[in-house]
Regions:
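C-terminal cap of metal-dependent C-N hydrolases
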Residues: 27-32, 379-381, 398-438
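Active-site-adjacent C-terminal substructures of enzyme catalytic domains
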Residues: 259-260, 269-395, 407-411, 419, ...
């Protein structure tokens, strides 16, 4: 493929997993809406899907819409599978430094909160990120995005949260916007000022309350005025920000016009799932991690989903695996309860240094019991809904953005089967080829 055209016809697919039909939950999450056959093709015009189906039908649709087949660049899928471009709905894209030392400490028994309390964990990355230049952070972001693209990811949520002061958080959001302008990928910026209490507050007797006041009174107004962040996230967890503090921050964010999401119940039942359900009416899109939700939290998320205000449970199995956990988020309980489930990398230097959604899918199938079709829905259409983009990306149907991956195999089942590998032939973004493995 040349990469210069926005009008593209991919022919000869063995199957196309369209994920058409919107957000998946319950039994519907296992339906990838797959079209089979060696003559299935996808047509993109002007950066959007024009038609998908049997080759003769698609050709007729192209001509019926007044287009000439000669106007399309053609690409032979050679019997491979076509899926929507993958959507990574939870990443910490911009940071400086690595944390392999604490990884080794954890292997010897040190706990996450123990490392954080000693100034490690998030705080060590905050110090390194504050000290890094703009160009250093941009270079790291570019490298990571390139690796993600090569693994099939075309849309990426990117959080701030490694500065924890007004100027630094604004800088991270601005750098995210700059990367979005230069990258073929779509970046969705999230403000995460409430990621941890920074070192300069920790000597105070009221450290957490004082920092919550700073997030609400200083950081949020500046972020809203900047106009880059689309949503606000909070680390709602015992020992970080409790349910009451998280509610205050997220309510203020909603008043500022931001969508809501939260790190919820990662380490222990902390009321995060319940809070996410409570805030569904204020625009809460997702509750993430959920490795240790309460039964009440699962039920609350199921109720709002049934009521038509779904909050997506965005699960992060690579994090649990990298931390050496012996339990993972109860994905089957969420799906069986009718809660829509997404998967994401949680890319970050401390607890999930992975850039591969296919690897995340593999872990989810092995450790959480998801089927390959459920896992694919979780990194496409459901992940898109977790970002408020369900009407734009995440499925292959007319009018949707033409974000596509052509794989070197023909079945959905093989996608998580190839552990740690991404046998990709090509990645297309808005109808343009942006990656091709030769």
């Amino acid at each position: 493929m040349s990469g210069g055209s926005k009008d593209l016809l991919i022919e000869g697919a063995g199957a196309v997993a369209t994920l058409a039909g919107g957000l998946r939950r319950g039994a519907a999450q296992t339906d990838a809406a797959v079209l089979f056959g060696g003559d299935v093709c996808v047509a993109a015009w002007g950066g959007r899907i024009l038609a998908v189906g049997r080759q003769d039908d698609v050709h007729r649709q192209i001509e019926a819409d007044g287009h000439s087949l000669d106007a399309f660049e053609r690409f032979d899928a050679r019997g491979g599978l076509i899926t929507p471009g993958l959507v990574d709905a939870h990443t910490h894209l911009l940071f400086a430094g690595t944390r392999e030392v604490e990884w080794q400490l954890r292997a010897r028994g040190a706990g996450y909160l123990e490392i954080l309390a000693a100034g490690g964990g998030i705080l060590s990355t905050v110090a390194a990120t504050r000290a890094a230049s703009d160009e250093e952070l941009l270079a790291g972001g570019r490298h990571r995005l390139g690796q993600m693209l090569a693994n099939g990811t075309t849309t990426v949520e990117a959080k701030s949260g490694y500065a924890l002061d007004v100027a630094g958080e604004l800088r991270l959001l601005d750098l995210t916007a700059r990367l979005g302008d230069e990258s073929p990928m779509d970046l969705v910026p999230t403000f995460l000022g409430a990621h941890a209490v920074p070192a300069e507050f920790r000597a105070r007797s009221d450290a957490t309350e004082a920092y919550v006041a700073d997030v609400i009174g200083e950081q949020l107004p500046a972020v809203a005025a900047q106009g880059i962040a689309r949503s606000c996230d909070v680390f709602c967890e015992t020992g970080v920000f409790d349910e009451i503090q998280s509610r205050r921050i997220l309510s203020a964010a909603a008043e500022a016009g931001l969508a809501l999401r939260l790190h919820a119940d990662e380490l222990a039942p902390s009321g995060g799932a319940e809070l996410a359900a409570e805030l569904a009416e204020l625009g809460c899109l997702s509750a993430d991690h959920l490795a240790a939700p309460s039964e009440q939290g699962i039920a609350a998320l199921a109720r709002v989903a049934e009521a038509g205000r779904p909050v997506v449970a965005t699960l992060l199995p690579a994090t649990s695996w990298f931390l050496g956990k012996h339990h993972f988020a109860p994905a089957r309980r969420f799906i069986d309860a009718g809660v829509p489930v997404a998967l994401a990398t949680d890319l970050n230097p401390g607890t999930s240094p992975t850039l591969s959604l296919p690897l995340v899918m593999s872990i989810a199938c092995i450790e959480m019991g998801l089927t390959p079709a459920e896992a694919l829905a979780a990194v496409t259409i459901n992940a898109a809904h977790a970002l408020g983009l369900g009407g734009q990306v995440g499925s292959i149907e007319p009018g949707m953005q033409a974000d596509l991956v052509v794989w070197d195999f023909a079945t959905v089942e093989q996608l998580p089967y190839w552990l740690g590998a991404s046998p990709i032939r090509a990645v297309v973004k808005r109808g343009r080829p942006v990656f091709e493995r030769r």
